[in-house]
């Protein structure tokens, strides 16, 4: 079937819109779909997403499409950019409308709610084995990407041809560098765990612990991410790249991160509901914390930072008490014998 668009993006929030703008700025005809018809009508009229990316005009190659069937019929390349807790339900909606030659990539960062499963497992459960799958991950703030500021990400998938095609679609010498990666599991995991650690970094700064504590938390958070990744068969080297260290540093150190700002509010004494309300958008790390904690427990992987953040978010522990417990842990070598 012939494409009338180069790619369809599902999800018209800040990140989905930013990726659609970036693709269209490359000269690729891009369709953007969202679940709210009123919001989509506003985007079409304004030629801008004033709610999430005010003042950034849509390129001519970006078209708004409120009809999911038409959006999915237009292209075999489908980029899903929705919160992790609705990822499965969006795929369920899309399934009967997908073309037989469809190829599915997502930029959603997270795990399945309650179970902590990777999104590739959710996608396979919903869609079966017939479609190539891929994931985009890396240090990307939506506003900077949409503005065309230099950014780098990684892509990995089940089909090398699809991965290479995505690199060609996304890569732009002026705005976006894209690295191919063969670690499908590692890229998915990095995007979820970094959200958890970013909440911890925000809490540390909110308490007033300073740069030393923040840096220690990021470093040990990377250790936890790598430990969990290796238990799932991921390549440890992945976590020194864009989807690991890169995304972790970005999210933990810049207040554009909702997860970091959420942690800051908690560290300054806000309760969970008040802190979420202050952000005003989805804080992926709130759910990710429970998902990552569940996964680590199931695999028997020690993740003390994640465990303390879980206790703050879901068991009412104060951030100060969580910090005290981490600091009072048994002394151990930084590089334990293998």
UniProtKB/Swiss-Prot annotation:
Which Gene3D superfamilies does the record cross-reference, listed alphabetically?
Answer: N-(1-d-carboxylethyl)-l-norvaline Dehydrogenase, domain 2, NAD(P)-binding Rossmann-like Domain
For sn-glycerol 3-phosphate, which residues are the binding ones?
Answer: 109, 138, 140, 194, 247, 257-259
Give the Enzyme Commission number: 1.1.1.94
**UniProt KW rRNA-binding keyword:** no
Pathway connected to this protein: Membrane lipid metabolism; glycerophospholipid metabolism
**Biological-process GO terms, alphabetical:** carbohydrate metabolic process; glycerol-3-phosphate biosynthetic process; glycerol-3-phosphate catabolic process; glycerophospholipid biosynthetic process
Q: Which reaction does it catalyse?
A: sn-glycerol 3-phosphate + NAD(+) = dihydroxyacetone phosphate + NADH + H(+); sn-glycerol 3-phosphate + NADP(+) = dihydroxyacetone phosphate + NADPH + H(+)
Quote the PROSITE patterns the UniProt record gives: NAD_G3PDH
- Tell me the active site: 194
Q: What class of enzyme is it?
A: oxidoreductase
Compartments where found: Cytoplasm
**InterPro entries per UniProt:** 6-PGluconate_DH-like_C_sf (IPR008927), 6PGD_dom2 (IPR013328), G3P_DH_NAD-dep (IPR006168), G3P_DH_NAD-dep_C (IPR006109), G3P_DH_NAD-dep_N (IPR011128), NAD(P)-bd_dom_sf (IPR036291)
Single GO cellular component term:
cytosol
What the entry lists under PANTHER family is as follows: GLYCEROL-3-PHOSPHATE DEHYDROGENASE (PTHR11728), GLYCEROL-3-PHOSPHATE DEHYDROGENASE [NAD(+)] 2, CHLOROPLASTIC (PTHR11728:SF1)
Protein known as: Glycerol-3-phosphate dehydrogenase [NAD(P)+]
Q: Which organism is it from?
A: Shewanella baltica (strain OS223)
């Amino acid at each position: 079937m012939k494409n009338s668009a180069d790619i369809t993006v599902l999800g018209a929030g800040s990140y989905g819109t930013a990726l659609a703008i970036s693709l269209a700025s490359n000269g690729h005809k891009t369709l953007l779909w969202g679940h709210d018809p009123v919001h989509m009508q506003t985007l079409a009229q304004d030629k801008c997403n004033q709610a999430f990316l005010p003042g950034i005009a849509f390129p001519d190659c970006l078209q708004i499409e409120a009809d999911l069937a038409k959006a999915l019929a237009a292209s075999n390349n489908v980029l899903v950019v929705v919160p992790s807790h609705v990822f499965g339900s969006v795929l369920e909606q899309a399934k009967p409308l997908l073309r037989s030659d469809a190829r599915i990539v997502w930029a959603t960062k997270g795990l399945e709610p309650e179970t902590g499963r990777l999104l590739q497992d959710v996608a396979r459960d919903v869609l079966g084995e017939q479609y190539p799958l891929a994931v985009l991950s890396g240090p990307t703030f939506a506003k900077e990407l949409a503005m065309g500021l230099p950014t780098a990400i990684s892509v990995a998938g089940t089909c090398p041809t699809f991965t290479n095609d995505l690199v060609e679609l996304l890569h732009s010498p002026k705005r976006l560098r894209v690295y191919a990666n063969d670690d499908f599991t590692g890229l998915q995991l990095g995007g979820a765990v970094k959200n958890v650690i970013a909440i911890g970094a925000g809490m540390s700064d909110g308490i007033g612990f300073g740069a030393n504590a923040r840096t220690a938390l990021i470093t040990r958070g990377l250790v936890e991410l790598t430990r969990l990744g290796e238990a799932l068969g991921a390549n440890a080297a992945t976590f020194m790249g864009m989807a690991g260290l890169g995304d972790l540093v970005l999210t933990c150190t810049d207040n554009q991160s909702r997860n970091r700002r959420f942690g800051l509010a908690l560290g300054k004494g806000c309760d969970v509901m008040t802190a979420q309300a202050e952000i005003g958008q989805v804080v992926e790390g709130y759910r990710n914390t429970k998902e990552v904690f569940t996964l680590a427990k199931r695999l028997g992987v020690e993740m003390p930072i994640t465990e303390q953040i879980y206790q703050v978010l879901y068991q009412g522990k104060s951030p100060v008490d969580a910090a005290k417990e981490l600091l009072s842990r048994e002394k151990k070598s930084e590089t334990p014998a293998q």
